[in-house]
């Protein structure tokens, strides 16, 4: 909301940075909090949480697609939604019947967290996943706008609606991924989703200039799979990590993962400027799901994996 009150670019950037900081402070505690309500079905529970975040992230694209609304109304609408969420949590949400021991974050415990090979591999998988996820979300609107122009569809609202659909369908993906993770296994689910999303990153350039139905189909499949596995990495940490260090482990995993997103979000427009086109920029994202898949397949073969998803690995 501060963006509406300032005229200085520096202050606007500051408010954007603070938005990111406070979002980061919400995410790890919310994952830990919802985990205290579930011993079985935890993957679905965390998947539903990440799915709601995904739908919330997609919502501004829908608001933006309504052409007569200015960007100011987009900011106001999303701010109202955020404050409503805070009010609901403050009044109705509390810790569940399966709490973790209370232990403050401690830098000295980071080494202990990563001495756990299962947590380490789950985190590497998450890092690969994050290399792809937020860059896709951040630049898919620009990619689709440029692609639509190539297809003689010069309508920014159409690209915004498409981006809303491509990102928003990830909410359903998170729920499906949670169900698959609980029933079929988390390492198998994450590996499958990263294989599909990585393939979509590879194929995006080939459908850039049509046909339109292939571009739309790829966008929806990519949006569904790119985030469907997101909650499963954190769920694995809650299952394999020392209960005393779960909060620290989640914070470290998420913190490093979000730092990696800065790299790919920064790289993609540089690549587009260098190539003078957005057609092939998503190739930069492929190493993420490739490395992440390898990490999860290694984890699947470890004896500790029997603790994941009640033995479903």
Where in the sequence are the language-model features?
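Helix-loop-helix hairpin linking two adjacent transmembrane segments in secondary transporters
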Residues: 40, 48-93
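A late C-terminal transmembrane helix in Major Facilitator Superfamily
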Residues: 240-275
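C-terminal transmembrane helical hairpin of 12-TM major facilitator-type secondary transporters
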Residues: 169, 181-236
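C-terminal membrane-cytosol helix-exit motif in multi-pass small-molecule transporters
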Residues: 80-99, 292-300
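Cytoplasmic helix-loop-helix junction between adjacent transmembrane helices
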Residues: 15-51
